[in-house]
């Protein structure tokens, strides 16, 4: 089993401030930044990078996050001022803001001749489910991914983070 986790509160809060994002955009980009940082850190090349791009057809537009192999990450969202209603009290509707009619594209630049590019159709626009789908479909690695951003009442980031857990080749059912 390969597992990686991140506490990304500081990264996501800094992005919120820099891009002057409203809560729904903060939650969406924060999830993508967390995923990119973990995936960048999982690479086997020290000077490589990974780019995650989501074009979901939702009002946020394109979301992009780029990470190096140390997990240093940056990103943007086309429309940071989008504010959507909550799914229910306390739960932002990130899936509706991102949209589910589009693609997640992952570009792994391992400093070889050509970068590896993999794309999958979005499952939900909630980002963690889409990352899971990417690993299962494009890399054939059974994966569990969870990503979260908790927005405080003053619109700052109270907490952000996530995890990726993957079964490695040869893993038995007992390990699961």
Language-model-detected regions and their locations in the chain:
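Interaction interfaces in information-processing and related assembly proteins
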Residues: 1-176
């Amino acid at each position: 089993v390969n597992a990686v986790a991140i506490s990304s509160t500081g990264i996501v809060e800094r992005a919120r401030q820099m891009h002057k994002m409203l809560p729904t955009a903060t939650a969406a980009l924060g999830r993508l930044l967390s995923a990119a940082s973990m995936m960048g850190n999982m690479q086997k090349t020290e000077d490589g990078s990974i780019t995650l791009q989501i074009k979901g057809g939702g009002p946020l537009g394109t979301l992009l996050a780029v990470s190096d192999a140390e997990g240093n990450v940056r990103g943007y969202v086309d429309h940071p001022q989008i504010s959507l209603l909550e799914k229910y009290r306390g739960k932002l509707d990130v899936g509706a803001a991102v949209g589910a009619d589009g693609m997640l594209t992952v570009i792994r630049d391992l400093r070889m001749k050509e970068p590896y590019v993999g794309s999958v159709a979005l499952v939900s626009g909630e980002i963690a489910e889409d990352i899971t789908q990417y690993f299962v479909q494009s890399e054939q690695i059974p994966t569990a991914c969870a990503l979260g951003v908790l927005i405080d009442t003053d619109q700052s980031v109270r907490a952000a983070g996530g995890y990726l857990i993957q079964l490695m080749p040869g893993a038995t059912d007992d390990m699961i």
